[in-house]
């Protein structure tokens, strides 16, 4: 059951289907990003890949600005989008250098009254002030400024627990749902959390891990960052859909810059799976540098940003899954690393070895091999191949 509007009408789900961008920073000519799944429906996961300074954050900010409640630090740009429910609604937004902005055509429509976008930048830090002192009403502000903090997750959890103990029914449901999220595996090794009060009446949250109980502020930064934005998102969904049996399963749009930031490789492999399970009706549009993120997803809409001298072009492959690709194949073909997946030292030694073979110079080949032998993986099959190649040059013994 979704949140009711004042006139008792339920706002329909609204998602992005396309984004057209022109003359925005590194994007010069008009280009359109398809945000659908190829079958006319919005893709649940769109992943934007590109080198540093190729416009990943710019694209997320362009999308965020279409939530008319959030206009922070505008820059001149022209972009348009289609918002989808049962039909497409197209709007064109112009933001000038002066800071003024306007929609060039009709934007607001009762059919998209429920459109709210949640955005999270790379500095996903929890606020340390109390909830009553500082409430960030702009749901995408951290995308525009690293100084913007997210909800004080620990205090929100403590306040919710206090409300539960005072018999607030809605609080009990919310606490149960956020516990389900945080112990679902989205935080590796975290199996539970509890509320603790010291003798001097200071309260805090302790997370149960394989290594014992750990306070939230003592967890690694990847854990703190994940708790910060996931709890922030959950709180906003609880408030947006107060009448829903499960607000976390309601429609929303979430933008995350560098979703793999501070996550170790195994965590990167599973993060999409966990977020999809906990927020099944959310459209995620995220940027990433991780081939593991690309490899792990079952059905993704991939956006590749490719630098071309003084501008960036947008390319979208037809494939929707890369689960059968190796990490090296993703790095080579999608992230354009080529031989850069190997160290410069390795490449130089291989070149030296090959040149020695061509010149039939055993001494130089042996010198290159000895250095390669030190840096190759202990179980590398290449070591045996190099020895076989070198044996053809081995001096005959009498």
Residue ranges and their predicted role:
Residues 2-15, 109, 277, 292-398:
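RecA-like P-loop NTPase motor core
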Residues 2-60, 276:
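Pre-Walker A-like glycine/lysine-rich segment at the N-terminus of P-loop NTPase domains
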Residues 2-15, 22, 143-249:
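Extended helical coiled-coil dimerization/tether regions that scaffold
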Residues 41-77, 221-235:
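Phosphate-binding glycine-rich loops of NTP-binding sites
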Residues 2-7, 58-113:
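Conserved P-loop NTP-binding catalytic core
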Residues 288-289:
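Conserved H-loop
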Residues 96-186, 331-334:
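Coupling/switch segment of ABC-type P-loop NTPase heads
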Residues 257-258:
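Walker B catalytic acidic pair
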